[in-house]
Amino acid sequence: MVGITSYGGYIPRYRLSRMLVVQNMAWYFPVIMAVAQGEKAVANWDEDAISMAVAAAYDCMAGKDRKAIDGVYLASTTLPFADRLNAGIVATALNVPENGTVNADFAACTKAGTTAAIAALEAIESGQRDNVLVVAADQRGTKMATMYEMFFGDGAAALSFGKDDVIAEFKGSYSINVDFVDHYKGCGKDFDYGWEERWVRDIGYGKVIPEAIAGFLNKTGMKIEDFSKVIYPCYFGGTHRGIAKKLGLDPAKVQDNMHAVCGDTGTAHPFVMLVAALEEANPGDKILVASFGQGCDVMAFEVT
């Protein structure tokens, strides 16, 4: 049996009320009032993607044997080093063995976390690895008075994969890759360049995620009704609900997108939502996880 052996997360303690943003910046861009609910998580001045990843990894590995880890994969779109192995820093902070361990960075799109998880699971299934720690973290800067400022939050999550003491068995995966430019950030740039919102909602989230989930169901023979929780990131509230309707999902089975409590944490967000679902899961529950970013990865797990 291969699957998740432990999980952890880290959300910075600081919060920014979205209403405070509205009170100060709505004069410039009034549309932000439409998404002013709740608050977003904000990293402290001395935090970055690596420090948050380490915190999530510590939470994940509490009480576990770190010496048994033979792979550390770090996913992020905001890695602080361009020419230094960021995953190696996380591994060193955890005192993971230097010899016989494969560390790797996964980057360049917000589905990098799930791609790293699939790579880890395939490595374990093939017998090349025994225990792989996958961590995803993001600290995305935004321009003031933009929808991204309202939507994005900072955070990290970690999943340990292996064959022993599995708490959620891996049941399969499916991926589609689409060079869909909902946003992009060039080298050396501080902020994303975003395309028109309706394009992102309707042709991005609203089309790509349902298509990927349908492909997974067709590949595995599973049915959407089999799942107790279905997880997919989408910071557009109406589109998040619309995807569920398109899939024929009971709204009660859709995992909350956590907009009101922390915001969208980028590469970490599918894992952040998965950790929240695992906290409330019961043995036998099946959980489907999808990501989004120049395509979509879909994974399924069954809680043991």
Give short role names for the model-derived ranges.
Residues 1-49, 146-203, 207, 300-304:
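Condensing-enzyme catalytic core mediating Claisen C-C bond formation in acyl metabolism
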Residues 4, 49-114, 219-242, 246:
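Conserved beta-ketoacyl condensing-enzyme motif
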Residues 62-70, 96-101, 125-134, 207-210, ...:
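Structural signature of cysteine-dependent C-C bond-forming condensing enzymes
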Residues 54-58, 87-91, 114-121, 157-161, ...:
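Predominant activation on well-ordered alpha-helical scaffold segments within soluble catalytic domains
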Residues 27-47, 78-131, 242-273:
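Conserved catalytic cysteine-centered active-site region
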Residues 123-157:
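Flexible, glycine-rich active-site loops centered on histidine and acidic residues
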Residues 1, 75-81, 107-112, 136-141, ...:
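Acidic, glycine-rich active-site loops and adjacent beta-strand->loop/helix elements
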Residues 7, 135-138, 162-164, 172-174, ...:
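Fold-independent oxyanion-binding glycine-rich loops
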